[in-house]
Amino acid sequence: MHFVSDSDPWFVILPPGAGLEALLIRRGGTPEPISEKVVINYRVEPGFESPSRHSRFWDYAENYFDRRPDPDRGLLGNGTSGEFAYNDKTMSFAADGIPILPYTDVGTFNPYPLFTITAKDSASGKVLASTKTLIPVSTEMGCRNCHGGPWRWKNISGMADDTARDILRRHDRAHGTDLMARAEKGKPRLCQSCHADPAINAVGDGKRLPLSTSIHGLHANYIPVKGADACGLCHPSHKSGATRYARGVHASVGLSCVNCHGSMSDHAISLLRFEEGKRSATSLIKHLRPVAVQARADIKPRKPWINGPDCLACHVDFKKPSDNPSAFNKWTGEAADLYKNRTDDTGSLRCVACHGTVHAEYPARNPYNARRDNLQPLQYSKTPYAIGANRGCEICHREAKRDEVHHRNMLRMVRRTVRQ
């Protein structure tokens, strides 16, 4: 899910700018990914075409990023409709920086806007394939729970000015900065101008802790609740919130944030341990007590957005997990190993292409429409399960197969059934 801080006059954590990726596969005995002589376009559903009507980002974009995108265009030039470009590195078509927001032109909130994706022959214009998917996007960052203020947008979502101002005042008082004065003069700072953040390829100033480490490390010392409820104070994951972004099969069987990411204190310790030697890391970690292990030293250091929970920590050999699975402290070695980036054994198919995106693994259940996340498996296989599940190899291969080409144990039958 793409978060948008929605606090543009005061600071920006993340700007509008989500991405779509597409794989086009020629079906047959030996399916073949197509990378040339095609044009793939995307278009958002009606009501989401004018994000600049609902955000102050375009008034401040030049201040933060030295760019002045046109209204309803993102920092990379893409709009809410446009054309994909082929990415040789990921071997997929990509449209990055789409400035989508959860606010609609008719005054409703929906953090799951649908996009229609159409592939055409570049010479003849013939439609080769068409499908629908969504971009999960939310402005429901719960800073107000501690910093005060209402929700900015219709008491549903977004960061109010009162909330953002309190954050800056506290930052200035704790760290001797002048962020409030800068913002009041119309020159607010991008958080990543000081704090490194691999999420947007920001290197920071090299002196401060990375952004994710700073935020989790500080707040873990103050948040009074435990377990997944601690995550839901800030992230749009709480079951009573407007977003409820944990939609996948993991959530449906009762797993929570903690099963993969650890408790708030454990999560923070893992990030702070990567920064050992920095004075601020030492200060933040010294009062944190681990939950899942005996000592802080037992928690493996990790870099945000690079070392994440490894799917195979629970799905050993792609088999059924244990009754109480946990991927905490079993981190991926590099970004390429993260679920969102990982490929199958052939190296040509991404895991998410068949199994669904992060936090919405098939079969998913969307709070705004139960089928909304499952449109592609329903389109291609008439079930909400992973595309090709239950030995459905003929979806791409046009015939049954006996070889487990993509990963081990892929030919076993799905063990759960879900009504859609």
Regions found by a protein language model. Give the residues of each.
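Inter-heme linker and motif-flanking segments adjacent to c-type heme-binding CXXCH motifs
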Residues: A123-S130, P150-A183, D197-Q420
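Extended acidic/polar, glycine-enriched regions
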Residues: A85-K185
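Domain-length functional cores that host ligand/cofactor binding and catalytic or interaction surfaces
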Residues: E184-S193
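Extracytosolic secretory-pathway proteins
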Residues: R43-E45, P51, R68, D72, ...
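Short flexible loop/turn segments that cap and initiate beta-strands
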Residues: G17-A18, L23-Y60
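Short, solvent-exposed loop/turn segments enriched in Ser/Thr/Gly
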Residues: P15-L20, P111-F115
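Extended, solvent-exposed segments with strong compositional bias
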Residues: F57-L101
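Beta-strand-rich domain onsets/edges
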Residues: M1-G19, I25
